[in-house]
Structures are given as structure tokens and as C-alpha cells.
């Protein structure tokens, strides 16, 4: 007469099967790193990389020049099914898109970077720049309003600013950008990061976006 399997044996088999399933599951996050400049970001694995050459072209950079030659490292990721630099810099992004970068600062420019200059790296965020943009009929940025602004001093001489703001570009729908900019101790390196999408997207996916923002880490060289 055949006997049924003992409960502990059945449980052991189920646990073994579960471990196999866990082991086969893909990673939950993609880790974006620039080890030489000790810069790190974590994005959901569903966010796909944006073609670096497409980012360069969107910024008007020479796509044939290597990052090391121009002193600029950039990486973009997009939660949209069709990753595009338009979702970083265009009028609208229905899903979160993020850009992370490190730029060498020329010796002649190292004394010119104030916190307001960091705030204004992508859009006219500082009060004075907002006033200038409002008075300029050719400005493509409209209805910019700062939601939060925080000066950052994480240590090791690194300093910067974290700003979240609403805005519209070229008459497009309202967007939200969450940006963090840092300078290292001697202002020889500029570290940049932002994630943006529509206001509806930002509200619906705020936890996901906040996790990405909080993962952005810059460490001064030892």
C-alpha cells in the first residue's frame, strides 16, 4: 500500500520550489553608477535606458566625441515604453524620465557657481531668473512655480540644492521636475540629476519617483 508524503517532506519541496522561483526572478532595480566620480542612482528595472547618442543630439553635443574627451558623463532612463530624450527635455512626459550626469567644471568657471546658478541649470527656477523669464516674450517656459527647495550639505565638502517645481514648456501640459544639483569641495565637478513627468504622473507615481530621488548619491573622492 502506497503511503502519502510526510508533511515535512511536502513543505520542504514547496520551499525548494519557491527558492528556485525567487532565484529566477529578475532584479527589481537597475543601478546606474559612475564609479570614478562616485555617483550612484537606482531606478526600477522597468525603466529603460535612453540612447546616449540621442541624448547628446538633443542637447546639441557632438555625438562622435567620447565622454572622457569632453568631461561630461550622462545617462538617461525612461519609464515610457518608447524611451526618448523628448521625455527629458520636451513639452510633456506621460511617464517618469530621469537624467543623471557628472560634468567637469573648467578652472575659470569654478568661482561662478552659486546655489541659484545650480537651481537654474535646466530652467529659470531662482526668483531672479523667474522674473526675467516672465518678462521675456520669447521664453518657452510658462507658469513655473517652486513646490519645495532645500539646500543640501551631505558632507565631505559636497554641497548643493534639491528643488521640486511645476512648469509648462511651449504651451504644453503642466509638468513636475524634481532636480538635485551638487558641487564637490573645490567646484571642479558638477553632479546633476532630475526626474520629470506630467503632474498627473507625478501624483500617481510619487512613491516610485521619491524612491529614485532618494537613491541619488554623490560621494567626494577619498
Would you name each region that the model predicts?
Residues 1-14:
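Bacterial N-terminal signal peptides that target proteins for export
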Residues 182-186:
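A short, solvent-exposed beta-edge/loop patch
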Residues 38, 112-116, 199, 203-207:
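Soluble non-cytosolic domains of exported or imported proteins
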Amino acid at each position: 500500500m502506497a503511503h502519502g508524503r510526510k508533511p515535512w517532506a511536502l513543505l520542504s519541496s514547496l520551499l525548494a520550489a519557491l527558492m528556485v522561483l525567487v532565484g529566477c526572478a529578475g532584479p527589481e532595480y537597475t543601478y546606474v553608477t559612475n564609479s570614478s566620480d562616485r555617483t550612484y542612482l537606482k531606478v526600477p528595472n522597468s525603466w529603460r535606458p535612453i540612447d546616449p547618442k540621442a541624448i547628446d543630439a538633443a542637447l546639441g553635443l557632438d555625438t562622435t566625441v567620447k565622454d572622457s574627451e569632453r568631461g561630461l558623463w550622462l545617462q538617461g532612463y525612461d519609464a515610457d515604453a518608447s524611451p526618448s530624450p523628448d521625455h527629458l527635455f520636451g513639452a510633456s512626459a506621460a511617464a517618469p524620465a530621469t537624467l543623471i550626469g557628472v560634468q567637469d567644471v573648467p578652472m575659470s568657471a569654478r568661482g561662478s557657481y552659486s546655489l541659484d546658478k545650480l537651481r537654474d541649470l535646466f530652467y529659470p527656477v531662482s526668483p531672479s531668473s523667474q522674473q526675467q523669464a516672465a518678462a521675456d516674450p520669447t521664453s518657452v517656459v510658462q507658469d513655473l512655480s517652486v513646490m519645495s527647495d532645500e539646500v543640501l550639505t551631505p558632507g565631505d565638502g559636497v554641497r548643493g540644492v534639491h528643488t521640486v517645481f511645476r512648469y509648462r514648456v511651449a504651451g504644453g501640459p503642466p509638468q513636475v521636475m524634481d532636480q538635485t544639483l551638487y558641487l564637490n569641495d573645490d567646484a571642479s565637478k558638477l553632479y546633476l540629476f532630475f526626474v520629470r513627468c506630467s503632474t498627473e504622473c507625478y501624483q500617481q507615481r510619487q512613491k516610485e519617483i521619491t524612491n529614485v530621488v532618494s537613491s541619488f548619491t554623490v560621494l567626494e573622492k577619498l
